[in-house]
Amino acid sequence: MKNKSDVIFSEVVSSFNNFFQDQKKSVDLTVGLSGGVDSMVLLNVLYQLKTKLNLKLSAIHIHHGLSKNADHWCKLCLDECVRLDIDFYQKKINIDNSEGLGIEAAARKARYQILHQQANEVLVTAHHQNDQAETLMLQLLRGSGLKGLASMPLFDKERRLWRPFLKLSKEIIEEYAKNNDIRFVEDESNKNTEFDRNFLRLEIFPKLINRFPQTIKSLGRSADLVAEGLNLNKAIATEDAKNYFSEDFNKLNTKIFSTLPRDRVINLIRWWLDKNQQKMPSQKIMDQIYAQIIKAKQDAQINIHISSKMSVRAYKDFLWLVKIKKEKNSFDLIWKGEEMFELPGSGKLLFKSSLGKGISLDKLGSSVLRIQNRKGGERFKPERNQPTRTLKYLLQKINMPPWERELLPIIYSEDILVAVPNFGVHHEFVADEDKIGLTIEWINYESKI
């Protein structure tokens, strides 16, 4: 029978070979090192396997400053890395809880952002089987969908994140630490049952395990099965997406609502939001999106907030992801020859000289160009043989969504609307084919997710 240390080494080597078997050169791993028993054991195990697996190791410690002992934790991590001759980095961060996540969740979010920024080729964390069980239970209690219930993958390809201990119990890790004299710290906040995860770990799981001894393994297995279902849904959505998406995945063709069954539609919308790195909205909001589109008339302008910063809007047979703008900026600015002109809250303008294109500098004469926001009611005549039209009508003809029309900057000379960036130039001011003209491109930050 294998001893507990052998079990750890065997699991890590097996996991490594599954994900890095095609690697021709050394694998560059950065260990997320908190100073706790799990991460300190992970560092030691990878150090022992360094030669066998051809590893290049480094470690990073995130200093939250939330504990009076934080400096001590950092020093312990540094001392251990010096002892093992492993490159060590530490990063101090301030916790931003403006999103109302709570200190625990906000700290976790900030920690992962820094870890991924600082990590080399692959980030390695010491999450284990008990962590997975706790995560699944928390997601169940929140009423999460498949993505939440799948919990933590062993290897996250997109984020280059490896969790080699995920199939190992906390008990095995602690025994390894004891048998190998691993130095580690105890975070005093782990005893605080005001935090949901600690409450489950200290109050609920002991009772579950006493009644159902296989609780931890069973929950881990359930998370694996949910992950398989999630992967199947992703594969179906990827196939469906080929027929219903724009190239940049910013908008979704609403034809899906009449050609696909409801569950496939919801699945594709979830995939779309995930593809654009949006937090998954509640089932109530998903039902609202579906119901409003099904009932909507051709010209309906649907606007459903899926978070404090993003909304799903409908226009001209498409669903769009649109940033929520708190207020419209008003401006009246003079162009002084800049190649790039930053606009208040609505992107920037790029000015270029082009032969036979854009605004004629000769026809403009000494008049200055004024850059203004739209106020409504503007009229424009880009074609000599066409009547003057309202700008709204002309922009509707090119299917510009109303939220972009609201932000669109326009260019005046005296009282004449001479140019609309990304659309056209007043016919009387168009540059002749053999003359230098001024082209103006609008880059709309608000349309970028």
Q: Can you annotate each of these PLM segments?
A:
Residues 2, 7-38, 58, 64, ...:
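AMP-forming adenylation/ATP pyrophosphatase catalytic core
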Residues 2-206, 235:
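Core alpha/beta nucleotide-donor-binding catalytic domains of modification enzymes
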Residues 87, 164, 206, 213, ...:
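Proline-centered helix-kink/hinge sites
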Residues 176, 200-208, 263-275:
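PAPS/PAP-binding and catalytic site of the sulfotransferase fold
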Residues 190-197, 217-227:
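Internal, active-site/partner-interface "lid" segment
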Residues 203, 207-219:
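Conserved anion/nucleotide-ligand pocket segment
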